[in-house]
Amino acid sequence: MASKVKQVILDLTVEKDKKNKKGGKASKQSEEESHHLEEVENKKPGGNVRRKVRRLVPNFLWAIPNRHVDHSEGGEEVGRFVGQVMEAKRKSKEQQMRPYTRFRTPEPDNHYDFCLIP
């Protein structure tokens, strides 16, 4: 297909040169066509496609309960809020890891009494 485009451009330039030699002006339409075809020739396929990487965003805001702010409590409120954020992060991590840890079960208390594997 690229060779066909080059051939069309070559034909248009030859035609334009012939008209210029005869003294007549090349038609405006042929100039526009040759200009458009040159633009098409210079373009690379898929050159402007950007591939974005999807990153996992830690979405733990759903787990933070609505807080009623009492400005008279200063230090305790900060500690409580930090605890809530840590708990929310832990919950979100558990939710994200749930498909991977589905079949793992903890060992019972008497596991080593009955285990035959040394």
Swiss-Prot record:
Region Interaction with SIRT2: list its residue ranges: 30-88
Predominant location: cytoplasm
| One of the record's GO cellular component terms | microtubule
* Gene Ontology BP annotations: chromosome segregation; negative regulation of protein ubiquitination; negative regulation of tubulin deacetylation; regulation of cell migration; regulation of cell population proliferation; regulation of mitotic cell cycle
Q: Which domain of life is it from?
A: Eukaryota
- Database matches in InterPro entries: BEX, TF_A-like/BEX
Which locations, inside or outside the cell, does it occupy?
Cytoplasm, Cytoskeleton, Spindle pole; Nucleus; Cytoplasm
Keyword terms: Cytoplasm, Cytoskeleton, Metal-binding, Nucleus, Ubl conjugation, Zinc
According to the UniProt entry, its GO molecular function terms are: alpha-tubulin binding; histone deacetylase binding; metal ion binding; molecular function inhibitor activity
Extent of Basic and acidic residues compositional bias: 28-44
Modification after translation is described as:
Ubiquitinated and degraded by the proteasome.
Where is the region Disordered?
14-50
**Region named Interaction with alpha-tubulin:** 30-118
Binding positions for Zn(2+)?
115
Keyword check for Ubl conjugation: yes
Is Cytoplasm found in the keyword set? yes
Q: Which family does it belong to?
A: Belongs to the BEX family.
Subunit comment? Interacts with alpha-tubulin. Interacts with SIRT2.
Q: What does this protein's UniProt record list under function? A: May play a role in microtubule deacetylation by negatively regulating the SIRT2 deacetylase activity toward alpha-tubulin and thereby participate in the control of cell cycle progression and genomic stability. In absence of reductive stress, acts as a pseudosubstrate for the CRL2(FEM1B) complex: associates with FEM1B via zinc, thereby preventing association between FEM1B and its substrates.
Descriptive protein name: Protein BEX4
What high-level taxonomic lineage is stated for the organism? Eukaryota, Metazoa, Chordata, Craniata, Vertebrata
Gene assigned in the entry:
Bex4
